[in-house]
Design a protein with these regions (language model features):
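Short, surface-exposed helix-loop/turn micro-motifs enriched in polar/charged residues
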Residues: 3, 97-100
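Intrinsic disorder/low-complexity detector
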Residues: 9-92, 99-111, 146-182
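A short, conserved structural fragment
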Residues: 1, 127-137
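Short amphipathic alpha-helical interaction segments
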Residues: 113-127
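Minor-groove-contacting beta-hairpin "wing" of winged helix-turn-helix DNA-binding domains
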Residues: 1-7, 138-144
Length: 182
């Protein structure tokens, strides 16, 4: 007896809402490819997308292995969102020396549904790694190393998504086609 599992409309809508955070930036990087989350409505495209993602995971190719320093954020509940939130605040106030931003562990805890203790542990780890400093006066110093870390993470993330979608930039198409015929 075979059991066939099929995604529900509600499940697909939630998947598309979640994946729009990846598809939208990639569509900006490759405007001629007409990339949008509605590609996930196509069973074959959706299957191939997740098959490629699974191949990376099964080979052990994770963010923490490729970019281990980002693990102090992304391996924690809400850590990825906290990292991105701090980055976006820092970019608004960026100087050559980093940025100084308003900071409240309580605000981050409420925003990302984690405890203040959890936020403080993430911040303490990031501070010990030299990415930022809680100034203790409601402000935080964000160092250039943190900004570089997040930008490296984002670049890797979008590279993964580009591969999962199977986008091959025009300048590589000819070379890819030639090697596949050899």
């Amino acid at each position: 007896r075979k059991t066939k599992i099929a995604p529900t409309e509600k499940g697909l809508d939630e998947l598309k809402r979640y994946m729009s955070g990846a598809f939208t930036p990639v569509s900006i990087l490759y405007p001629t490819f007409n990339i949008n989350v509605n590609l996930l409505d196509n069973d074959t495209l959706r299957h191939n997308f997740f098959r490629r993602a699974a191949e990376y995971l099964f080979r052990g190719l994770t963010f923490s292995k490729v970019l281990p320093e980002v693990g102090l954020f992304i391996d924690k509940d809400g850590g990825r969102m906290i990292m991105l939130y701090l980055y976006l605040q820092a970019i608004k106030n960026k100087t050559a020396y980093g940025a100084i931003i308003a900071y409240s562990a309580s605000t981050l805890a409420k925003e990302f549904f984690v405890s203040r203790i959890h936020v403080n542990r993430i911040i303490k780890s990031a501070q010990e790694a030299g990415y930022l400093k809680d100034r203790g006066d409601g402000r935080m110093s964000i160092y250039p190393a943190f900004i570089e870390l997040v930008e490296n993470y984002a670049g890797l993330y979008f590279a993964y998504v580009t591969h999962y979608i199977n986008v091959v930039p025009k300048e590589r198409r000819h070379a890819v086609n030639m090697t596949s015929t050899l």
